[in-house]
Amino acid sequence: MATVTILSPKSIPKVTDSKFGARVSDQIVNVVKCGKSGRRLKLAKLVSAAGLSQIEPDINEDPIGQFETNSIEMEDFKYGYYDGAHTYYEGEVQKGTFWGAIADDIAAVDQTNGFQGLISCMFLPAIALGMYFDAPGEYLFIGAALFTVVFCIIEMDKPDQPHNFEPQIYKLERGARDKLINDYNTMSIWDFNDKYGDVWDFTIEKDDIATR
């Protein structure tokens, strides 16, 4: 069965002659315009998919503080939790038994040595000998007081153990920070305070710690 195709007169482009040359009918021009608009639509979709049509966010050009944290105000920023810094929180320590706490305190104290260790070992035997030979109680109290004073002076003059510094200390330049912490762990507390006492005041300008 044959099919007859009927062409509408309007579907056939008309070409008319004029003194300026041939002219194509408006239907072909419309087809060309549709083709161009289709290419533009594809190009717009491609640009949108690549993210090139997004609006660029405003850049924060305000002055930024030295210790300012992103997205969280300094008053609300929990140091040690959010940044993972070496910070101690007493509430996080699991509380054990009374004798366990005493054992932990004893283990945390370094063993005495030198002259301090000598007077520590002689203290209780000296008190026992004084009571055995019926020494006057005043002498025993004076001896105990002298022992306490000498023992505490020697203990306080020892370098402190590594502990938690303020967050600003960890934000110092690496060389200055390591030197500061090393001096803290090796110097007596009195010499350290004389040398670095102003470091804890972050409101004043300071020279380079590494040169001290």
Curated annotation (Swiss-Prot):
The stretch annotated as transit peptide is 1-48
Instruction: For this UniProt record, give its keywords in alphabetical order, as a comma-separated list.
Output: Chloroplast, Membrane, Plastid, Transit peptide, Transmembrane, Transmembrane helix, Transport
Provide a GO CC annotation, any one: chloroplast thylakoid membrane
PANTHER family referenced in this protein's UniProt entry, alphabetically: PHOTOSYNTHETIC NDH SUBUNIT OF SUBCOMPLEX B 5, CHLOROPLASTIC
Q: What does this protein do?
A: NDH shuttles electrons from NAD(P)H:plastoquinone, via FMN and iron-sulfur (Fe-S) centers, to quinones in the photosynthetic chain and possibly in a chloroplast respiratory chain. The immediate electron acceptor for the enzyme in this species is believed to be plastoquinone. Couples the redox reaction to proton translocation, and thus conserves the redox energy in a proton gradient.
The subunit field of the Swiss-Prot or TrEMBL record says: Part of the chloroplast NDH complex, composed of a mixture of chloroplast and nucleus encoded subunits. Component of the NDH subcomplex B, at least composed of PnsB1, PnsB2, PnsB3, PnsB4 and PnsB5.
Protein name (record): Photosynthetic NDH subunit of subcomplex B 5, chloroplastic
Source organism of the structure: Arabidopsis thaliana (Mouse-ear cress)
State the gene name recorded for this protein. Answer: PNSB5
